[in-house]
Amino acid sequence: MGELPYKIQELKLRRIEELNNKLRNELARERMTASNACLSIIDYTSTHKDYAVPEVWGYPMVGENPYNNTMRKNNFARSHEETSACCTIM
């Protein structure tokens, strides 16, 4: 009868050790401060064209669609022609 409280204490200790290990792993993970994250976003948006922000990049030329991905359309058309099946699963 005296062994049951010992097993319960052992289980509690094991759970606490697992929690400590999880917390140590989380603490060891690389962190980024909010200011560095903001600078990273600003750097990305200032070097990659995004016509959704016309104040920075201006408007696209008339008749030009900068988001039109013709390469993807051509690959899809080619892959669709090569298959003889009725369906294509991507």
Swiss-Prot record:
Keywords: Lipoprotein, Membrane, Methylation, Palmitate, Prenylation, Transducer
Molecular function in Gene Ontology: G-protein beta-subunit binding
GO biological process: G protein-coupled receptor signaling pathway; pheromone-dependent signal transduction involved in conjugation with cellular fusion
Domain of life of the source: Eukaryota
Residues of the propeptide: 88-90
Location, primary (coarse class): membrane
Keyword Isomerase on entry: no
Localization terms from the record: Membrane
PANTHER family: GUANINE NUCLEOTIDE-BINDING PROTEIN SUBUNIT GAMMA
Family from the record: Belongs to the G protein gamma family.
Protein name per UniProt: Guanine nucleotide-binding protein subunit gamma
